[in-house]
Amino acid sequence: MASSSSATSGDDRPPAAGGGTPAQAHAEWAASMHAYYAAAASAAGHPYAAWPLPPQAQQHGLVAAGAGAAYGAGAVPHVPPPPAGTRHAHASMAAGVPYMAGESASAAGKGKRVGKTQRVPSGEINSSSGSGDAGSQGSSEKGDAGANQKGSSSSAKRRKSGAAKTEGEPSQAATVQNAVTEPPLEDKERSASKLLVLAPGRAALTSAAPNLNIGMDPLSASPSSLVQGEVNAAASSQSNASLSQMDERELKRERRKQSNRESARRSRLRKQQECEELAQKVSELTAANGTLRSELDQLKKDCKTMETENKKLMGKILSHDDKMQQSEGPSVVTTLSIQVEAPEPHQGGHGKAS
């Protein structure tokens, strides 16, 4: 029973760093510091061993003598501390060792947004642990198990209260670490909003104005925004109407051009056909003219031959008349004259009968 109570009390209270130091309120933080110094005791001399610990570490029960004892007492000379802001907030940052108490590390970042809580004095924790130990010693084996359960629950509650105190009052070193490593919450939200606005793949509309009332109640929108939306809608409708009118005009112009081209092509084909017909008629007429000319030439030749024959006949007739007049009397001449003059109407078609 005594061993179980001592075990529970040992889990609740961290061991003292040096002789005569008070009990520590933050058990996890002190345990991580002791684990770090115990792990680094066998290594070479740490370059930051001679620096004095921050006042927060001295308040939590870790003195400079206890920290330097892991590397050998008096082995490293005193070195002046570096300027503010350059020292490491925790030993895990200097040597690259992961921080053992994850709750306190996350609580240091939350301390900026959560209000400060009142620190519970260490006397109350000691008194509560003492009362739990006394109750566990005075009970039986069955009661001892219940006391162990109560002690474990009380230790869990104390761990939670320690984490809450760590969240409420972060140390100065943790504040410096969070200020250096993590940007403020407002900067994160601002950068996130910028990233959302500047994300690739979101095309910007040129005609429509951006809507700034996304996720807001439409009933609570201001009348100016509603009027602006109506104006934008009217402008977009006007632009669409103008575009449609321009499209219709373009279509009409294209149709007119197409009809003009078709009419010009038809007229060109018609004129070409007429020209071909006229050329054919000209060729036919020239051929007919040639035949007529040839016939005319033939007629002229026939006329000339007939004229020559007529002249020969007339010469023969005249010579015959002269001979008849010389051989016969006047009666004969008269008869001959009558005979000669009688066929004149028959020979009048030639126009040269005497």
From Swiss-Prot:
Known role: Interacts specifically with the 8-bp sequence 5'-CACGTGGC-3'in the abscisic acid response element (ABARE). Also binds to the hexamer motif 5'-ACGTCA-3' of histone gene promoters.
Stretches assigned to the bZIP domain: 250-313
Protein name: DNA-binding protein EMBP-1
Swiss-Prot/TrEMBL GO biological process terms: abscisic acid-activated signaling pathway; regulation of DNA-templated transcription
Composition bias type Low complexity, residue spans: 127-140, 232-245
Presence of keyword Transcription regulation: yes
Sequence similarity: Belongs to the bZIP family.
Subunit structure: Heterodimer.
Transmembrane segments: none
Region (Disordered): 1-24, 106-193, 230-273
GO molecular function terms attached to this record: DNA-binding transcription factor activity; sequence-specific DNA binding
InterPro entries: bZIP, bZIP_plant_GBF1, bZIP_sf, GBF-like
Chief location bin: nucleus
Species per Swiss-Prot/TrEMBL record: Triticum aestivum (Wheat)
Domain of life: Eukaryota
This protein's GO CC annotations: nucleus
Region (Leucine-zipper): 278-299
UniProt keyword terms in alphabetical order: Abscisic acid signaling pathway, DNA-binding, Nucleus, Transcription, Transcription regulation
Region Basic motif, residue ranges: 252-271
Subcellular location per the Swiss-Prot or TrEMBL entry: Nucleus
Biased composition (Basic and acidic residues): 246-265
